[in-house]
Amino acid sequence: MNNTEFSKIAETTIAYIADKIEEQDKEASIDVDLQGDILNLDTDKGIYVINKQSAAKEIWLSSPVSGPYHFFYEQGKWKNKIGLELMAILTEELNIKFDNI
């Protein structure tokens, strides 16, 4: 995947995460702040940071619950080196249903 393709997929994914949270968080318990390529989620568990790392062609997640992760894009999913999926981690920790996009 070239840099342009990576940027488009990563930016679409991060925007999708922000949109899904705002759509499903009926109590507005998660403060969503998307600034460029950086998504901050302020929750009662702490602050999540999701951002794109262009040089590595990865999305990075910093979770106050489970720690840091680096995800690469493979077969339509963002996975880390041991096979954990970005959307699965977010679904479990935030109680928001994400589909793979």
UniProtKB/Swiss-Prot annotation:
SMART domains hit by this protein: Frataxin_Cyay
Keywords: Iron, Metal-binding
PROSITE patterns membership: FRATAXIN_1, FRATAXIN_2
GO MF assignments: 2 iron, 2 sulfur cluster binding; ferric iron binding; ferrous iron binding; ferroxidase activity; iron chaperone activity
NCBIfam families per the UniProt record, alphabetical: FeS_CyaY
Entry similarity comment: Belongs to the frataxin family.
Function: Involved in iron-sulfur (Fe-S) cluster assembly. May act as a regulator of Fe-S biogenesis.
Protein name according to UniProt: Iron-sulfur cluster assembly protein CyaY
Organism placement in taxonomy: Bacteria, Pseudomonadati, Pseudomonadota, Alphaproteobacteria, Rickettsiales
Gene name of the record: cyaY
